[in-house]
Amino acid sequence: MIFADRIAAAEQLAEALAEYRGRQPLILAIPRGAVPMAQVIAARLEGEMDVVLVRKLRAPGNPEFAIGSVDESGWVYLADYAAAAGADEAYIRDETAAQLETIRQRRIQYTPVRPPHDPAGRIVIVIDDGLATGSTMIAALHALRAKKPAELI
């Protein structure tokens, strides 16, 4: 779908998720593009907002193309085409380490004075501003399932 901008997309998404209004959902944004969207959705649904930190693993020679992703715990998702894109074990190990360091720095930046909100037993809605390969969403959902939300949307 095409939207005028991220805020317009967030407003339409909040409308589609209206059944969760007043149920204190936890809206988790995949930074950076989804953060303003999650703020709008959290306000409309009367929920809390936080971030879920994941990073794409970039293809060799093509940093915009995801060959996989990593979550904050270090769990790695690799697309079945990663090797065909030129990513060998050493490249994946180094790229994973680099992205985990970025995640560590972003955790300090996004939640410097408090721990992340705990999704356990809560309705959790994950927001991203696009799903080109779906890699970062796969990692985000994997990370969140391990934390036992009541519902994961």
Language-model features: locations:
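PRPP-associated nucleotide enzymes
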Residues: 1-153
